[in-house]
Amino acid sequence: MSYIQEQFFDIGANLTHKSFESDLEEVLFEAKEIGVKRMSITGSCLEDSIQAAEMAERFPEMCISTAGIHPHNAKEYSPEMFSEIKALLKKEPVKCIGETGLDFNRNFSTPEQQQLSFEAHLELSLIHISEPTRPY
């Protein structure tokens, strides 16, 4: 009987948070020790997206990153700023768009601000819709 070792990919590592500044390498080591093979460092605003890309460049064997604007940060959205997000998507470690979406639970940004930001993200996305005329 063969043994299959479980390996995990963490799709939403919020490692740009200031609480990880002093021990990032230790966090990555511990993640690897418990079976995390790779992880995606999440960008939730322009600054975090830049920082996430830099982290992923430092640890390419384990990390990739995302670039995007979280709904809570949508109040920061502008077409000029989003051009910088798009430019980040051309960097090697940046593999995904996001974090993005709509979050009307706490409304740190207005619904209108969230919609503008989300629509900009959608324009960059590949969307698959099966049987779009069929009502669900």
Say what each PLM segment does.
Residues 42-45, 130:
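Catalytic beta/alpha-barrel core
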Residues 2-23, 46-126:
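Active-site gating/metal-coordination segments in enzymes
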Residues 127-136:
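Single conserved hydrophobic/aromatic residue that forms the stacking wall/gate
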Residues 36-40:
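Short active-site oxyanion
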